[in-house]
Amino acid sequence: DFLAELSAEVLRGPDTRRQEASAAFGFWCRRARLEALAARHASPLPRLGRGLAFHLAPANVPALFAYTLAIGLLAGNANVVRLSSRRVEGEAPLLAALRRVLERPEHAAVRARTSLITYGRDDAVTADYCARCDARIVWGGDATVAAVRAMPMPPHAVELCFPDRWSLAVFSQRAFSALTPEERGALAHRFYNDTYQMDQNACSSPQLVLWLEDGGDPACRGRWWEAVAAEAA
């Protein structure tokens, strides 16, 4: 119920609706979407959360702190989510929506096991949280992940890390040759959102584009990059 109400709050709020990443999160945690997720992972065996999960959210991906928090809640954990100080201002509308829903009396139990914090680069603070957690979720570059993994956790604790990852895209020359200008523009808009909004730093942002020479007109490649340039202008 909490996440479904958060979804509704995000999708009807003008400030969060204007932010594509926040709106996408609101759409992702709709009740129907979560029920489908629960059905996919259904088990006849009883399952419990790990306990206290400490999340280090990345600085380069908007709204990702909300996804990692949501997964932590769905897994049955209490959660401490550290936001980068570089993200706090940009995430203000989504944070405000989250606070409004958490403050509702019916969600007191969720509020009691949810903390969102921010602090500057301070290994001593991070190490203190690591020493107290039952699960650690680390998002960041290889160096950040290695530094955090060197910080001791309780013997029973588990961790999940998301270090540097690289993606590429493969485009069909034949398929791109068949696109109308409108279809090409719509696809370029989506490519721009996936790639340039995060300066190619997201795990799914392609660092390399390969063209499959499967027919069609090679000139479609130039038309494609012109459409992408128009989106970036």
Q: Where in this protein do the model-derived segments appear?
A:
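Structural signal for hydrophobic packing residues in well-ordered secondary-structure cores
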Residues: L3-P14, L102, E106, P152, ...
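Short glycine-/acidic-enriched loop or helix-start segments at secondary-structure transitions
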Residues: F65, A147-R149, C220
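Flexible loop/turn segments at secondary-structure boundaries
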Residues: V61-P62, V145, D217-P218
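Conserved NAD(P)+-binding/catalytic subdomain of aldehyde/semialdehyde dehydrogenases
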Residues: H107-L208, E213-G215
